[in-house]
Every structure is written in C-alpha cells, then in structure tokens.
Amino acid sequence: MFKFTAQQHVYDINGVKVGGQPGEYPTVLIGSIFYRGHKIVSDGQKGIFDKDAAKALLDQEAELSAETGNPFIIDVLGESVEALTKYVEFILENTTAPFLLDSISPDVRVGALKNLGKDPEIQKRLIYNSIEEHYTEEELAAIKEAGLKTAVILAFSKKALKPNARIDLLQGKDDKEGLIAAAKRAGIEQFLVDPGVLDVASNSWTTEAINVVKEQFGYPGGCAPSNAVYLWKKMRSKGTPFFEVAGAAVFTYPITQGADFILYGPMMNAPWVYRAIATTDAMIAYNNKLTGVKMGTTEHPLLKIF
C-alpha cells in the first residue's frame, strides 16, 4: 500500500469520521432510501411511505455498522419538495446518523432546504448532495442561508471524463470558477469529493481521480458506483450470488486506492456490502504495520470482524 504526501483532512460529521490515510479510518458507507421505485414508497410526490419498513432499514444499517465498524451516512432521495422534506424529518427522528439531502432536481433540494430552516441539529447532520458543474447562484445562496458546512462536490462532466479533466473542474481552469471555490462562496467548509462514475469499467478512472484529489488536496474522496453496477445488465442476468460478488469487486476497488466513502445504492443490499467493505478495510489497516499509519479509531473492522 501507500501513504499520501499531502496532509489529509479528516472531517467529523456528527460523530462520523471521514478522510485520512488508507487504513486510518474505516470506509464510510452511504446507502440510499426513498429513491424512485423504492417499494416502501407508495406516493413519491406526497412523500407517503411505510414507516415501519423504513425504520427496519435504518436499524439494519446501525446493526451492520456496529458489527463491522464501518460508519454510515443515509442518502435521502426525494422527487418533490414535499416528499424530500417529509423524508428528512423522518430521518431526523429515527437515527442520529448524518444524511445526504439528495434529488436529481436542484429545485427540489433547495426547496426542501428552505422548508427545513436553520436548525442547528440539521446543520450538524445534513450534507448537501451535490454542488456540480451546473450549480446556480440561487442554489449557492440557499446553502449559505441554511448555514450548511458540508457538501458533496461532484467533479464530473461528460466533457471531462479523464482524471485530470475532473481535477480541472474542482480547481477551475482559465476563467472558469472551480467547484471548490464555488462551494466556499456558499459557506461550505468540508468537501467530500466525488469524481462521478460513468460505467463499471471506467470506475478505474474515477478511482484514479480520487487518488489524485487526495494526493494533491487531501480532501476526502469517494464515489457512487452503484448506478453503474445496477445498470450492468449482463451481470445482473446471472443472478445472485454472481451479481453480488461482482458488485463487491466494484465497490471495494476504489478503497484499495484510497477512497474514503462509497455510495452503494439501495440499503437493502447492506448485508453483503458491509461485509465486503469491512474485509477490505481490515486488510488495508493490517498492512499499515509496514507503512506506519496508525488506526484513528478502536472501532475498526480489523479489530471487529475476526
């Protein structure tokens, strides 16, 4: 394994540590809930859902985290302002975990942010997902008004697929403002950099970009290979356990190259994802007997899964 030469930023998001050298802290796992097509949601516009089923998913996540040592963040998705607001309120009441405020629509994210107000509890736990190349000044203003300090920075564009091009999105090029500078204008102080994943094969380019981000800037880096995995029709057609084994390889590869967090998709897949990630984390941490990097927590997979 290796050590990054840049000083690594380690953020504490309501008790969840993310960042650092390979093996220093466990990988943070981010599972999705209330996504489009999620069976526990009966009305995605009004935010009507099965609360018992949602609570069971949250409880399972907490149990797996306690078993493996991998901390978790909840990816809360919503199709409308009303729905996303209701989902966040449920999360606030039923877990102490940090969460991503997530929607494919920036208007939905901003609307929900305005509904939630400047609650100190929300400010500690809410991670804006995400600030990306098409951000608007209204969006940045809403983030600043809400007093948020943490955001996912999506350094991805179909015009910037190679790793170095994604770095240009982060730091800016010529007269184009970089995403980090834009995020700072919105009051963001903690940056979770996600270079984006186009498909399974190019997860290697994403991983290279994460490595460069950590080497040059020291920001926590990670990605969301889940969409690419679930769109992999040829492998999905083979069914379980073949799909899960292949998925585990896709999710763990970035970690071997320094990634700090993984968005793994639907929370129902947590049982196999946690075990795969924890095993990888343990091996990396053991190798640090050679690199000299000390574990930053006693709640580490190396100390829990064997």
Swiss-Prot record:
Catalytic activity: methyl-Co(III)-[glycine betaine-specific corrinoid protein] + (6S)-5,6,7,8-tetrahydrofolate = Co(I)-[glycine betaine-specific corrinoid protein] + (6S)-5-methyl-5,6,7,8-tetrahydrofolate + H(+)
UniProt entry keywords in alphabetical sequence: Methyltransferase, One-carbon metabolism, Transferase
Gene Ontology terms: biological process: methylation; one-carbon metabolic process
InterPro entries: Dihydropteroate_synth-like_sf, MeTrfase_MtrH/MtxH
Transmembrane segments: none
Cystine residue pairs: none
Keyword Repeat: no
Keyword Transferase in annotation: yes
GO molecular function, one term: methyltransferase activity
EC number: 2.1.1.378
Pfam entry (one): MtrH
Organism superkingdom: Bacteria
Role according to the record: Methyltransferase able to catalyze the transfer of a methyl group from methylcobalamin (methylCbl) to tetrahydrofolate (THF) in vitro, to generate methyl-THF and cob(I)alamin. In vivo, the methyl group probably comes from the adjacently encoded methylated corrinoid protein DSY3155. The methyl group may then be ultimately converted to carbon dioxide, and its oxidation would also provide reducing equivalents for anaerobic respiration. Thus, may function in the pathway that allows anaerobic methylotrophic growth of D.hafniense using glycine betaine.
Assigned protein family: Belongs to the MtrH family.
Name the UniProt record assigns to this protein: [methyl-Co(III) glycine betaine-specific corrinoid protein]--tetrahydrofolate methyltransferase
Species, as recorded: Desulfitobacterium hafniense (strain Y51)
Lineage: Bacteria, Bacillati, Bacillota, Clostridia, Eubacteriales
